[in-house]
Amino acid sequence: MFDSNHEQELSKRRTFAIISHPDAGKTTITEKMLFFGKVIRVPGTIKGRGSGKYAKSDWMNIEKERGISITTSVMQFTYKNILMNLLDTPGHQDFSEDTYRILTAVDCCLVVIDAAKGIEERTRKLMDVARIHNTPIITFINKLDRDSRDPIEILDEIEKELKLHCIPISWPISCGKNFRGVYHIHDKIIHLYKSKFRKNFLTLDSFLDGSLNEYLGADLSIYIRQELELIMNVYSKFNKEKFLKGITTPIFFGSALGNFGIDHLLDSLIKWAPSPLYRQSNKRIIKPQERNFTGFIFKIQANMDLKHRDRIAFMRIVSGQYTKGMKLTHVRIKKNIIISDAFSFLAGERISINKAYPGDVIGLHNHGTIKIGDTFTQGEEIKFIGIPSFAPEIFRLIYLKNPLKQKQLKKGLVQLSEEGTVQVFRPILNNDLILGAIGILQFDVVIERLRIEYNIDAVYKKVNIVLARWINCGNHHSLYNLKKSYSSYLAYDISNSLIYLAPSSANLNIVMSQNSDISFNATREQ
């Protein structure tokens, strides 16, 4: 039954991801958000191996051992009567392509930048993906209580490299050991950092008159007044329409570890981040207000529960609503199924649900039939688009210490590839198994998970591959000639799509120039 309060439920939801370079403080921010949402009583802190205390959002064994986030956790919490769906992406140096795909399931992104380092490599790559859909971006410049770069310099870098117009919402009062707080330009309030006074904020009147000297000292008071006058004259005021179009980004400053500025972020998500947005299908636009249910799979996680060796499919609801026991059509395989055991998440903990709405992420038990990119509807034959596979950047040849376990190896690799950990390629000329990943750490993850979850010992050999491009060709004669001339460089991926594995960029350029009627693509639609 379709709820009469559907529109109200939509307005109460925000679905967003946090993205950053390693060590920018993303996990700490996630923990503090859960703390503000009263999901956890004490925020966890990342500790070294063997400490026994880990962040709530890091729940896989390898994450706990290394103190890093490898998978993408999905967490739901309530803040000021708004239901927040937070997709926490990996913050370690090597992402999987799963990280990129997560951004297709959110309506807004929070970018975390280290105040001492500015924009770093992984932030750039994630932003490139977010910009494909013009996803609204909120920026948090973290670690102001440590030595940091000049704030204006960081804003200039954001505008130049990320092509976003910066709109400062808060502004730091000094930094490092002298960090005293921020002036909230939009609310016209000064928030003091670890104030020794009874009040932890000052009104605008206090900012303008001489009483500010009591809190900051005469010299700092004069300096911050002059700096703020400059900032408010140089930068534009916040415009929600431009933010929602991905043109501008509101800028916040603070210290996640010091629990300072996180509430400002959450308040901005409530006020400015969009409620669930529409999605494009192969036939039409699907709006969240529609009565009929639709959703798509953006992630699969194998063996979340080692006791049950299960696989979970993560579904973003696009329209309609989920009700326990409803019948859905799995469009790709043209099969109707009854969903009675969907659940929501809290960093690995499953909570059975009776209802869910657009913007929510629900988990479905998967026995091998659900794949990334699959669409579920109430009968309409559509497929959501814009959920791609990305060409890997690093490659390895995998082989077994015990050749008799080849069958188990293939099964394990299929599961790991379906959840986006790595991609698996089968050369057309031999039985080798070549793995491709976005970052080197994913290979360590595969070896460890094969050992723990499948009792398989495998090792790697280096392979002479530097680039991969999927082949798209409508001319059978041209495709035949390509296979004949370059068979040693061709392979099939897990979906049996043909891919060219190039030993160098020069090699790829030559092949492309000689086969102008064939497309060599860095992404492939699921």
Curated annotation (Swiss-Prot):
Question: Residue ranges of the tr-type G domain?
Answer: 11-277
Q: Respond yes or no to whether keyword Acetylation is given for this record.
A: no
Q: In the UniProt record, which is one GO cellular component term?
A: cytosol
Q: What does this protein do?
A: Increases the formation of ribosomal termination complexes and stimulates activities of RF-1 and RF-2. It binds guanine nucleotides and has strong preference for UGA stop codons. It may interact directly with the ribosome. The stimulation of RF-1 and RF-2 is significantly reduced by GTP and GDP, but not by GMP.
* Example GO BP: regulation of translational termination
Recall the GO molecular function terms of this protein's record. GTP binding; GTPase activity; guanosine tetraphosphate binding; translation release factor activity, codon nonspecific; translation release factor activity, codon specific
Q: Primary place of residence?
A: cytoplasm
Membrane-crossing residue ranges in chain numbering: none
Q: According to the UniProt entry, where is the signal peptide? A: none
List where in the cell it is found: Cytoplasm
Q: Which amino acids does the record list as binding GTP?
A: 20-27, 88-92, 142-145
Sorted alphabetically, which keywords does the UniProt record give? Cytoplasm, GTP-binding, Nucleotide-binding, Protein biosynthesis
Alphabetized InterPro entries for the sequence: EF-G-like_DII, EFG_III/V, G_TR_CS, P-loop_NTPase, PrfC, RF3_C, RF3_dom_3_sf, RF3_GTP-bd
Name of this protein:
Peptide chain release factor 3
Concerning its family, UniProt says: Belongs to the TRAFAC class translation factor GTPase superfamily. Classic translation factor GTPase family. PrfC subfamily.
Gene name on record? prfC
* Keyword Signal assigned: no
Q: Which domain of life is it from?
A: Bacteria
One of the Pfam families matching this protein, by short name: GTP_EFTU
